[in-house]
């Protein structure tokens, strides 16, 4: 019985130790991605800050990868990745700031075009916000096209579909 208790205890300690190592490595990667994204954000490179990607570094004379806020969220996407560090929530806030406060309508549409075939969980929100910005700029034809595109591209997402349909109905009144 004593051997069973020691074995179970050892397995539990081993699991906690390995999980802690993996968590810490994810945390360190997240901090790096967050810092890189923040530098891009501060330079006005909102697409790069949001998604990350390869870009040319003139000093190094080569393409380098720069992380984005989305990589921070991806690192902690698994429901078992707990506890989520504060950098996760900061990245969420920065993503919302980019989508709702920083992007112009044309930048939002350009981001959609750039990342449409690439995994990006924020494209539906970007597209809806882009349509709203076109309305603010009195570019109603573009707004209508964007909302219809949102329905066509993300029609299975009920929230996005309903929002786009609502905006189209308001435009057609």
Spell out what each predicted region is.
Residues 22, 29, 34, 41-42, ...:
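Hydrophobic/aromatic side-chain positions at a characteristic register within alpha-helices
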Residues 43-48, 138:
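Short helix-adjacent coil turns
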Residues 87-173:
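Non-cytosolic head/periplasmic domains of membrane-anchored proteins
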Residues 20-23, 61-86, 108-120, 156-157:
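Flexible helix-coil transition and linker loops at the boundaries of alpha-helical arrays
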Residues 5-25:
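Hydrophobic membrane-insertion alpha-helices, especially the h-region
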Residues 41, 50-101:
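Extracytoplasmic/periplasmic/luminal assembly and interaction segments
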